[in-house]
Amino acid sequence: MSINSDYNKENNNISPLNTSSERRSSLRNSLNNSSNNNNNNVINTPTANSINSSGNFSPKEFVSNIDGEEIIYQNQSVEYKQRLCTIQIKQSTLIIKFNEKGGFTKYLVSDTIVGSEITNESTNEYTIYSCVMNTLDVTKETRRRKQFSLRFRDRFELNQFNDKFVEAFLDTLPMGNPRERRIRVILNPKSGKKMSDSIFKDINELFKDSKIFVKKTVTKGPDHAKKIGYKFNLKKYDTIVFISGDGLFHEFINGLLSRTDFEQARKIPLALIPGGTGNGIACSIGLQDPMSCALAVIRGFTKPLDVSVIQQGDKKWCSILSLTWGIVSDVDIESEKYRALGDVRLILGAALRILNLRIYRGKIWYLPALELNKTEIAKIPKCSYSCEICESDNPISTIENVISQQQQNNTTTNQLRRSSLNNSSNGFSPKLNTSGSISNGNDDELRSMFSKEENIKIENEIHDHQNDDVLPLLKSSSDQHFIVPPTKLPNQQFLKETKEELFAKGWKVLEGEFIGIVASTVSHLASDFIASPTAHLSDGLIDLVVINNNKKFSKAGLLSVLTESSTGAHVKSDLIDQYKVQAMILEPSNDREGIIAVDGELISYGRTSMECMRACINLICRTY
């Protein structure tokens, strides 16, 4: 039985978001072909003093790739920093060459460009706005705003350059020119270290550079974001941005997928700018720097993200991270009292829980997606921006083929070594498809969802206005209070099936004593907690990690598991079993009360199912 690949089946009629290569932008393809895996750069040659990191390529390789591109526009008499320059526009780069002998050349890669404008018509001045790297260390990406001011000889040249620049770098973006877009920013002022408002002030300067329309909403308490997700006017915004931890995003998704028009609503691009304690989604997509996230919002490229349906009886929740039971949820929920300590609260909570360890009995039912042991699971390529597995029509077959290919190549390599025919290592190193396949969502629909707005506008909002409502509300005492109905996502009713029916459909069961479990659909639950290194954003699979109370158990070993989770190495422990599954059922024993959490939020303690819905929502991602 398979419930993973699509949702056009009788019981699952939700269709995954389109990830077809036909929807890739030509600009993105060119950038991948010319500078694969590059961080967006401003590079000065020949000295190669770069403002940004140059990633995994040398300046010579970069220049060679760019030299192969066609020149779209050229002007040899432009003033930059009071010096005469030649300006070239190519498909992926703006080039500024100083004309004097020995002058250097600047390359502004298109992925850093956020906007431009004619700043002074009387002096023919033009300003380009960008967001470039602060550091050469690509593992610690931080970005800053940077402006490039040019002066042209006359109005004709000024307008000609403006037309070519906008056409090449801004109009080609998936959601069109940023100045014609409308985004809504929702922030939680109490999230994490309470820095969300400060973060907004910083990134809003970049939004101003792009001339994007911004509406700011500050949440006023629990479930406010859920209510916004349920009733906001879908036609007013093309992107929803969150400044918070994962909790606010979780709330909004549960409102969004409760709408009667959820099939249309789920296509709207969503962006998460980390401002909380966990920030699992941001870490899973490699966007932990707020300014880098804002750049990604402006650029507007998206990838689909899996969502899981969690069910207990008639109650349902949507999950974007995980279902946890045992020590992980114990630490997460019980350490809330130490939230003022920031990330330290989890370390303190873990230490206290290990000293007073709880052992839980129960059953863990799961429907295998792949019959792989954890050594084989470790060989699955990690998710990337152009991910072969996430883009596949059948991720399970793709994973099986990758593992099989690795085994064949390893066998061949071993044979070559034994026969001494080749002393070098020719083992298979999995290379993901880098042709560029970031899904742009439904571009035509997105472009028609909003009208042109000339100037940026910031509106502080406590409650939506009456004309923002698009759905009938179940009112209580006032217009500000209403009940959001359960999620409309269709799921299979596994909790109603007997064990005989489950076994007949290929389910398996683990029974005994457990320290805890983590069932996740993304790699990270926090910056220092990589739950499953081989989890993918859109493969339709749940990574089930089980911490066993077996003969090899010790508190020292458990402490090692928790500390090594910061790198993902904990899955190698003898205490850990790992499975790639399509669905699972947790049956905790009633001999002691425990904690079950969905995305870090406490739910009732009892029999619980989890089912993954592939490519359910649209997430803003980077393109490099």
From Swiss-Prot:
Domain of life per record: Eukaryota
Chain ranges of the DAGKc domain: 178-314
GO molecular function: ATP binding; D-erythro-sphingosine kinase activity
Signal peptide: none
SUPFAM superfamilies: NAD kinase/diacylglycerol kinase-like (SSF111331)
GO BP, sorted A to Z: dihydrosphingosine-1-P pathway; positive regulation of asexual reproduction; response to curcumin; sphingosine biosynthetic process
Locations listed in the record: Cytoplasm; Nucleus
Region (Disordered): 1-54, 407-445
EC number of this enzyme: 2.7.1.91
Residues that coordinate or bind ATP: N188, P189, K190, T219, E251, G276, T277, G278, R339, R345, D599, G600, E601
Catalytic reaction annotation: a sphingoid base + ATP = a sphingoid 1-phosphate + ADP + H(+)
Record Pfam families: DAGK_cat (PF00781), YegS_C (PF19279)
Catalytic residues (positions): D246
Effect of inactivating the gene: Cells grow more slowly on solid media and are more sensitive than wild-type to the antitumor agents cisplatin and carboplatin; both effects are exacerbated in sgkA and sgkB double knockout. Exogenous S1P reverses the sensitivity to cisplatin.
Protein's name according to its UniProt entry: Sphingosine kinase A
Species name: Dictyostelium discoideum (Social amoeba)
Upper taxonomic lineage: Eukaryota, Amoebozoa, Evosea, Eumycetozoa, Dictyostelia
